[in-house]
Amino acid sequence: MNRFSYTLRKRAAARFFILALFVAAGIFLLTFFSRFGLRSPVLTEISPSVGSAGDILVLRGQNFGSSRGSSYVELCGNRLTESGYVSWDDDLIKVIVPGNTEDGLVYVATRAGKSNPEFFANELAIPVEMPENPMFSVPIITELSLAEAAPGQIISISGRNFGSSRGESNVYFSARREGEREESVPNLDGYDTKVETQKYVGFLTPSEADFDFEYWSENEIRVRVPDGAASGSVFVATSEGRSALQPFLVKSRVGKKTWTGRHTYLIQVGADFHNIKGGDAAAVTIHLPRPIVSALQPEAIMTESNPEPALLDYRGNSIFQITPADKTSAKNYSGARQNYVVTSCGMESEVYKDYVGLFKEKDRMLYKAYTRADEIIPADDKAVLELLPKIVFQVKNPYRQAELVFDYFVQNYKILPKTRNGDANPLDLIDKKRGDAYDFAVLYAALLRCAGVPCRILSGVLIDSDKQTRNHWWNEFYIENFGWLPVDTALGVGMEFKAFQGEPNSGKYFFGNIDAQRVAFSFAYKAIKQSLLSNKTVSMPRSFALQSIWEESTADVESYSSYWIVPAVLGIY
């Protein structure tokens, strides 16, 4: 018996050691043959090879294993965590690119080893070709002459790339109203600032009806702070892009305006024409009024037109032309219809009368335009000149003068239930003490203009709670360094009116305040020139817009009939 056998029999420790040695050898051999018996993973493709955090990365190849188990994907030096795996199959793996990923190699690791690598690039780290420097075209504001101003005051905007003339370019001021979203201007940081036809929510532009633009050049713009502007920002937009926002404060010690609500209407305007007869050159031109845009009516967007107009917007009208050949039925019928989405705002004012002064800038175009007599406002008529001092006496304050005239109307005049004939004289109201809303608006404007207070007539439709519309006229008068104030004398004296909610406002409320139950089509009377002196024209006094021509027919037109609809409300939102 040899010593080795004797030791194994006599010593238990020796026997345990030998057993452990055999077990370890067996495990080693099993692991060795198992590993080298498996096929190593092969990575043939990753998609996308360029991506960013959050992307799904797809790995294609073979020998990944039917389930993940202890296998893993290594992406750019980091092993993916449990939450990074979407699916795992023998030839396809889907993972989520984590947030800390940079450029680097991608591996698949299994018990058989690591695959060959594929390269992944983070797209945010890839250099890109710089776009053409817009500094040479996009408008840039370098300075505002005033950091704070009142409505109507002139500010000078200095900079470059404004353009030698205004054209379609514009200046935008903040304008916050009840229910309106915050100012919304696309991000300017990347200089991706090409202007498209769009509305900047929360901003308004200077008014051409108020003659707000004073001067425009490549390096300087002089513009008046528009009525309705609020503290916030100002910027310039041209066809080449937009400038950066500049902080700007709008303050007036004269008083304040509060936006009290808003309604959005889908409204239809149009006219029907029948039995147009005439020669080959016969044609009828339609001047279809468009809703205006103002501080109280900030949006008027056409959504549909049938047919398409010859001119979409010419001096506030869409122009259509129809001929005897334009037939939609055997009755020789034709016409035009347009739908608009119009937003109307209510407003209440608080005026500190002691801070209202006499108008100083009497050479200003707004003052000249809205204090003179015109085609429909007889501010220089003898009857007006005689009546005014009986109402205002020695009062010189423009706000008090406007208030005294309003009070005089409420105390002395009655409103007629129906609109009078178009050729009726509005000054009949002085003697007869009765008139319609048009008479009230004309006489009120005439008295204020005679007193040297800028005043204008707005025409449009009043909208009842049952969506019924009627032609209506009201006024606005202008206070320097404050802006326009609305006045509705017809409603002030008690014209019947169905409010959307509760009892309608009445009396003094309609001096300096206004509801949102109306849509305006005219700021003032619009004198339209006929295309040819030989053309025949049709006017429509006391209608929803104030303009000299509504229809115009060539000399070859023998006869036709027409019917204009009162703008109809199709929906309220």
Regions found by a protein language model. Give the residues of each.
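Intrinsically disordered, low-complexity N-terminal segments that are enriched in acidic
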Residues: P247-C345
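Hydrophobic membrane-insertion alpha-helices, especially the h-region
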Residues: R15-S34
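Immunoglobulin-like IPT/TIG beta-sandwich domains and homologous Ig-like subdomains
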Residues: G26, S34-K114, T142-R242
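Hydrophobic/aromatic-rich core segments of domains that either
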Residues: D439-S534
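Proline/serine/threonine-rich low-complexity linkers at boundaries of modular beta-sandwich domains
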Residues: L30-P41, E123-V138
